[in-house]
A protein has these predicted regions:
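Tubulin/FtsZ superfamily GTPase core signature
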Residues: 2-263
Length: 263
């Protein structure tokens, strides 16, 4: 019967289409690079919250903190309390040494959270206790696991004081020893380049936005299909053991927008 054969023929085509679609989905899943963004301390946690709120795609979020209350309020899907025995969940008290010891106490928990990653971004506000002291330890654990490790951190605004700046610079030096690439964003420069006036109220929001742009621009190159076709191997070859890195963000519209944005 012609009608029966026709129905069988189209059923076979539909089945082959479903199998092909399933194979393509599996291939895409295999090609997706597992990227995790780790917010360490209060500043890093705030940056992660901003990224989650902005709907950043293609990455997994982890918050790490000594402060139990701050951690409970964080929007990250994975949370790691650092140094629960040392700090009893009360934070590092703006002391980087306590932040470092807390992270060292929790190395196993850090490693478990990072497993399966091919690339991690470690974000923190330098100059405080947990971010400054713990971020280098987190980076060391990631690097020892063979994960491509990129730090994106901020230096304090001038109004935060010389002591905090000194702690930040020491923390950055420690972090540099354990990451493949390190992007340092001096918050004070945001006043010079921002299109809106930087005030005490919006200063840290502006810094969080720059941190988000840094993570988004690199992760999108790997996991978001685009005209510029870069895979993880390309990014790894550029960023592996690169030391200090620099980031530029530009935008433009209309004719010649790509060239104008680059300028």
């Amino acid at each position: 019967d012609i009608s029966v054969r026709s129905a069988q023929f189209y059923d076979k085509i539909r089945m082959e289409d479903k199998v092909m679609a399933l194979m393509l989905d599996e291939e895409m899943d295999e090609n997706v690079t597992t990227i995790k963004v780790i917010g360490v301390g209060g500043g890093g946690g705030n940056a992660v919250n901003r990224m989650v709120s902005d709907g950043l795609q293609g990455v997994e979020f982890i918050a790490m903190n000594t402060d139990q209350q701050a951690l409970a309020k964080n929007h990250a899907t994975v949370k790691v309390q650092l140094g629960s025995k040392l700090t009893k969940g009360r934070g590092a008290g703006a002391d980087p040494e306590i932040g470092q010891r807390a992270a060292e106490e929790s190395k196993d928990e850090i490693a478990n959270a990072l497993k399966g990653s091919q690339m991690v971004f470690i974000t923190a506000g330098m100059g405080g206790g947990t971010g400054t002291g713990a971020a280098p330890v987190v980076a060391e654990v990631a690097h020892d696991l063979g994960i491509l490790t990129v730090g994106i951190v901020t230096k304090p605004f001038s109004f935060e004081g010389k002591r905090k700046m000194g702690l930040a610079e020491q923390g950055i030096a420690n972090l540099l020893m354990h990451v493949d690439s390190l992007i340092v964003i001096p918050n004070e420069r945001l006043k010079m380049i921002s299109q809106e006036k930087i005030t005490l109220m919006n200063a840290f929001q502006a810094a969080d936005n720059v941190l988000r742009q840094g993570v988004e621009s690199i992760s999108a190159l790997i996991n978001v299909p685009a005209f510029i076709n870069l895979d993880f191997a390309d990014v790894r070859s550029i960023m592996k053991d690169a030391g200090y890195a620099h980031m530029g963000v530009g935008s433009a519209k209309g004719a010649g927008k790509a060239e104008n944005a680059a300028k």
